[in-house]
Curated annotation (Swiss-Prot):
The lineage of its organism: Eukaryota, Viridiplantae, Streptophyta, Embryophyta, Tracheophyta. Residues 289-438 form the Helicase C-terminal domain. This is DEAD-box ATP-dependent RNA helicase 36. The Q motif is unique to and characteristic of the DEAD box family of RNA helicases and controls ATP binding and hydrolysis. A motif (DEAD box) lies at residues 210-213.
Amino acid sequence: MEEPTPEEEGGITIMSKSRKNPKTVVNIQSQKLDSDQNTPQFEKFTNPNPSSDTTSATNFEGLGLAEWAVETCKELGMRKPTPVQTHCVPKILAGRDVLGLAQTGSGKTAAFALPILHRLAEDPYGVFALVVTPTRELAFQLAEQFKALGSCLNLRCSVIVGGMDMLTQTMSLVSRPHIVITTPGRIKVLLENNPDVPPVFSRTKFLVLDEADRVLDVGFQDELRTIFQCLPKSRQTLLFSATMTSNLQALLEHSSNKAYFYEAYEGLKTVDTLTQQFIFEDKDAKELYLVHILSQMEDKGIRSAMIFVSTCRTCQRLSLMLDELEVENIAMHSLNSQSMRLSALSKFKSGKVPILLATDVASRGLDIPTVDLVINYDIPRDPRDYVHRVGRTARAGRGGLAVSIITETDVKLIHKIEEEVGKKMEPYNKKVITDSLEVTKVSKAKRVAMMKMLDNGFEDKVKDRRKLKRKTLADKGLLKKRGKRQKSTEN
């Protein structure tokens, strides 16, 4: 296959591979790439079993961090560095570009936040670091973690995401906060529409792509190009992700000689304390058995549950249906306002609401300490997404239950998931529901929910979102490439 050609500036490059256009390249670093080298110019450390890593530092002092940072870690209960922190923090402090691949919950955020704050304390100015993340919720969570780790620095941190007032955000950027955490779309708009914004990043020392596999998705190419054009060539680029993708693999193949790659790969594994079960039913009975599972929460000692669905429409419909059945719940999806999404997450995390319905916006990265039950109402098409979803429960050595409601069309997906995770799902101990009153009650609640969605304009929102998405894809020349995916997407 013909080798991809780096763009003019070279450096670490990301190739967005597709069957129709294998040479689409997104440049994410401005240092020169020596394309004549046959041997990849990077240092790589592969850690196949991070849980038994004997090279991990015994304390944070050993990573080269300042005393204040070490004390802050102790105050936050961080007694010993995780493997990804042990291997990546010293390299970042040494000025290296870093790609860190490690599982969810491995401490990736602190692995880049601590060395950034260490350097900021030595030479404080704004904007010192730009952190790009795929979702609004992750952006706010990252801001909380930066503020906690930099609590003694009088840190100024700004979150720039969609769904919030752009004038206020522009003023926040012009005030030059130390750390800017953003989603790709909103920062692109501000950079292009206000000439006062690009100079803010003229001295930025660090660029971080968190959940890099998702940020580097082909749909974000234009946003990334706009971002990179305003950043200085002397910056450090840090990428952290839970999974390897073709874009990140291309990074390994086309990297600058300064890059360090840490990979903690244990395959797509689920923890031993997680019980994985399934219910096999007709498509028309999915709502009925969802309600059946939820009705058993109290008897099973389950305090909190997350229900994952594939679309915003399904998320809203199920939430309204459960409301009608007087099952306390809250929904989080991208058609909700930002304040509603943050409120939903806060209420669920605090235990005020026991059930959270969500699209995959909540499957990765979000710090939700205790979830007893995960329900896959819709089966994800990628086994990695399944692992991220069920990884919301059975954390930190605790037990957890994951139940997947599958239909005839999901069987191949389930077999693929079982093959990838190396574990068979067990049948859920369900009763056969024959009570006509129960069936009628759920059916009526479903109809009421659908009528409410028509009456309150939610269906119009879905149609408008679909039109906007198709227009965006068409403007980027991606509509034909992603046509099949578009048909199955109701966002």
